[in-house]
Amino acid sequence: MTIISELSVAPEKPIAEPRKSRKNNPEKTRENILQEAIVEFVQQGLSGARVDAIAERIHTSKRMIYYYFGSKEQLYVEVLEKLYGDIRSTENRLHLAELAPVEAIRRLVEFTFDHHDRNVDFVRIVCIENIHNAEYVKRSDAIKAMNNTILDSLGEILRRGCEEGVFRTDLDPLDVHLLISSFCFYRVSNRHTFGEIFQIDLPDESIKQRHRAMICESVLRYLQA
């Protein structure tokens, strides 16, 4: 996949009259389509992805996919929404508000590190969307809304930490989110080039655990400086 090919995306025309679904569970059908669409977009990029290939994987028709999503581009937008939604919804289940500020930050950093490490497809799709200059993220109010939840959560943790005297008073939640995300994301997005250039096996478990501890310590030292 080249940057040039990724930027040259010709919208596919939806079929006007899709046949009705023979599935008894529309939500399950949508979920199956989304899961296979993730695979196709990760492997082929947006420009190279084919709705026919997605349909083949789940033994359905191209018409069925258009029935649920309208177009390849809208399917891609909903893939983005699903992947961002997965990380944000899991964060909400960490119950960070119930933890002391330092422990809440540590838990959030560890979760972010683990999520990126275990969900390479999320990282790859975000890389593809950056090639497109966030053109499709711009189309989704849902992505913006769901990602604001992490800033609200971080802001509350930082506020409590300041009140308890364990964190600095000049912290911006967005800066802290960027600090955490940049390390966790880069380690996965660049693992092949970084690993080859510096001859390091980033997926190695001992190296992974060292880096996991390192980012936790780095973030906490920044907050407590």
Task: Give the residues covered by each predicted segment.
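C-terminal peripheral helix-coil segments that are non-catalytic and often amphipathic
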Residues: M1-E17, F111-R118, N148-F167, L179-A225
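Generic hydrophobic, amphipathic alpha-helix propensity
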Residues: T29-I38, I54, V79-L83, I87, ...
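Helix-turn-helix
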Residues: N32, E40-Q74, E78-V79
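Short coil/turn segments at alpha/beta junctions that flank glycine-rich nucleotide-binding fingerprints
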Residues: Q43-S47, N119, E164
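Hydrophobic/aromatic residues within well-ordered alpha-helical segments
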Residues: K72, V79, L83, I87, ...
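Amphipathic alpha-helical linker/stalk segments
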Residues: V79-L108, K138, K144
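Amphipathic alpha-helical interaction segments
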Residues: E103, R107, F111, I125, ...
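Amphipathic alpha-helical segments used for helix-helix packing
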Residues: A104, R118-D141, R191-F198
